[in-house]
Amino acid sequence: SAASDVYKRQEEETPLADGNAMILSAMKQLGKTRFVTVGHVCIHAFGDCEDKYQRMSTKFMQIFWPGVYKDMQKMGQVLARSDLNWTLVRTCPGRDGKVKKVGQNCSISLDGSQFRPGYSREALAEFLYEAAADQQMYSRKMPIFYREG
């Protein structure tokens, strides 16, 4: 059927990873060195201990969105191979698929030992801005951005 071709095509394509690869290539040609991007918590980083929320979120991605899961894994690999100064901020929306209210306290976990789904858009934007402005902030790392509590 036509629907099966669409699903098959979606699983084979990796637009986010390919887009990041093109951006990294252009940055290298232009002499730019700092790249900050956002990915899903299902991207595994070296040293992750993966708590129950991270494991569940990864399993859901593998089962319900295998194409997106594949794209995220490739994105992590593209960045890890790059010699640029990058930071991949891993996130996960809340159970309802929406971000949480403004002013919610958020934190960072470098090893995945602490993680809760959901976060404030404003808090994420502020963190991304700070990470882009500070050349050394989480350089070549994949911090998990999560809500506290």
Report the location of each language-model feature.
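Catalytic helix-loop patch of NAD(P)-dependent Rossmann-fold dehydrogenases
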Residues: 53-82
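NAD(P)-cofactor binding segment of oxidoreductase domains
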Residues: 8-35, 74
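Mid/C-terminal beta-alpha module of Rossmann-like enzyme folds, strongest
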Residues: 32-35, 111-149
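Glycine/proline-rich active-site loop of Rossmann-fold NAD(P)-dependent oxidoreductases
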Residues: 82, 97-106, 131-140
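Conserved beta-loop-beta element that borders a ligand/cofactor-binding pocket
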Residues: 76-97
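Short, small-residue-biased leader/transition segments that mark boundaries at the very start
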Residues: 2-7
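Conserved catalytic-site region of short-chain dehydrogenase/reductase
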Residues: 41-47, 94-98
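Conserved catalytic-site loops of classical short-chain dehydrogenases/reductases
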Residues: 33-39, 87
